[in-house]
Amino acid sequence: VKSVGANLRTGGPATANNEWIPDFVNYCEKNSVPLDFISTHHYPSDDPNWNADMHLDNFFGEEVNLNSDEIDRRGLLTKMVRIAKHEAGNLPLYYTEWNTSANEGDEFHDTPYSSALVTKTLIDNYGYVEAYSFWTFSDIFEEHGQVPGEFRGGFGLQTIHGIPKPVYRAFELMHQLGEER
């Protein structure tokens, strides 16, 4: 790539879960592979300490003790970013795909809790990440076939008919802040 254009930036490989970053960086260094940035994806379920039998509803249900660490899923994403940034070293870090859940059909996507988690995650990670790309803009999503209906737990900021979800409004408010922090 660099032989075609010396100014082209190379990085990646943009896979889920941050744990591959040290091996990737080490491989590139050992083999003189140009590496200008790290791109990755993350979801709360990427955490290696995540209990696979647990659903996000457990963290936001009425039974949860609001003073417990379990309610702080935003802290998990922030912890993951801090670790990834450390492992990336001086390389810029890009999250080219992220959301509050990796599961299509997770009702959590459509709730105000999701917008609070997104807002706090963005605020907590300001200055650590070069860019965040939220997955995805609309519930029109082809990977598993289109599921009909509004507010059915799709990944998007909007429903299939363009109705903004609470997380859309969170991004809208963040945009209105401009550069003010």
PLM feature segments, named:
Residues 123-181:
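Aromatic- and carboxylate-lined catalytic core of secreted/periplasmic carbohydrate-active enzymes
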Residues 1-132, 150:
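Noncatalytic carbohydrate-binding groove/subsite architecture in carbohydrate-active enzymes
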